[in-house]
């Protein structure tokens, strides 16, 4: 038994087709489909109401993550699948994800298949975010923020307090599962050009993603963030100190302050790590 949660905001052009495809592909399973209309101003709700699915409507736009959490809270089953309502994810790939659902805590549809339509201007930022996430989480993550994945309600609800209400929901849940030792399986899928206009703001959302990655890793593994900063400051301070002492014969306040700051940040990281381990 599986509950499929579809967060939707102004997706009138694609949501009907997505729901129809889900009903067809899931006919051999016991399932429910929950569409969470996140305050759409178009005919999204009207289109969904004509289908044999459950619809929940937010009174106004709260966010992608908030819509997913609403769907999870109202799901009848422990096994949850999320998929976007814009037609960009291949519904026909769902059976492949379900095949391994009993063996992993989360199965992610990784957009690394043979046909992947990601806009060119988004690829450098996506690559940078992936490299940052891979380093901080010490894990190879093929797709950090795929919107097609399966997980269990009892597991994800443990992290509701740190899962954001915006687009960064998927990024956070990926990092959270990896840094807490849960098993994640990536299944390659295709990814198509979405129907309608994207709601992502490249610059603002990109900066938010960076902050989110650092914050999430700090929450679970603070030394991974604090220690590199401490080492860099110490090395810079030491280099300046040696330069001033050897060549200028006069040591200013800057290198001393940098070295002191390095030790302070390092000890702060150690303290944060002790707190995390006692949780």
Q: Each predicted region: which residue ranges?
A:
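Hydrophobic helical membrane-anchoring modules
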Residues: 165-279
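Donor nucleotide-sugar binding loop of glycosyltransferases
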Residues: 11-14, 40, 90
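Cell-envelope/extracellular polymer assembly enzymes that use nucleotide-activated donors
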Residues: 1-3, 32, 172
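A conserved acidic beta->alpha catalytic loop
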Residues: 37-45, 87
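Short, well-formed alpha-helical segments that are part of the catalytic scaffolds
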Residues: 11-25
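Acceptor/aglycone-binding surface of glycosyltransferases and processive sugar-polymer synthases
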Residues: 58-74, 79, 91-167, 171, ...
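Conserved donor nucleotide-binding strand/loop of the catalytic core
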Residues: 30-34, 45-74
């Amino acid at each position: 038994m599986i509950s499929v949660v579809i967060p939707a905001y102004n997706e009138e052009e694609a949501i009907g087709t997505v729901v129809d495809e889900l009903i067809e592909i899931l006919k051999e399973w016991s399932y429910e489909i929950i569409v969470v209309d996140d305050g759409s101003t178009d005919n999204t709700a009207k289109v969904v109401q004509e289908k044999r699915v459950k619809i929940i409507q937010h009174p106004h736009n709260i966010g992608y993550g908030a819509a997913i959490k609403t769907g999870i809270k109202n799901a009848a089953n422990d096994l949850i699948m999320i998929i976007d309502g814009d037609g960009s994810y291949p519904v026909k790939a769902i059976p492949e994800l379900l095949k391994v659902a009993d063996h992993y805590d989360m199965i992610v549809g990784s957009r690394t298949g043979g046909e992947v339509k990601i806009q060119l201007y988004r690829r450098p930022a996506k690559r940078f975010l992936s490299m940052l996430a891979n380093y901080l989480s010490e894990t190879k993550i093929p797709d950090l923020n795929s919107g097609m994945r399966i997980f269990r309600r009892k597991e994800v609800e443990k992290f509701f307090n740190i899962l954001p209400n915006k687009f960064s929901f998927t990024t956070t849940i990926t990092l959270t599962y990896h840094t807490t030792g849960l098993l994640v399986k990536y299944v390659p899928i295709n990814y198509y050009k979405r129907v309608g206009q994207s709601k992502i703001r490249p610059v603002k959302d990109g900066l938010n993603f960076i902050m989110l990655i650092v914050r999430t890793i700090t929450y679970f593994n603070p030394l991974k963030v604090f220690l590199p900063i401490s080492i860099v400051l110490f090395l810079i301070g030491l280099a300046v100190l040696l330069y001033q002492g050897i060549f200028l014969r006069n040591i200013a306040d800057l290198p001393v302050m940098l070295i002191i700051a390095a030790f302070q940040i390092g000890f702060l990281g150690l303290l944060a790590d002790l707190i995390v381990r006692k949780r």
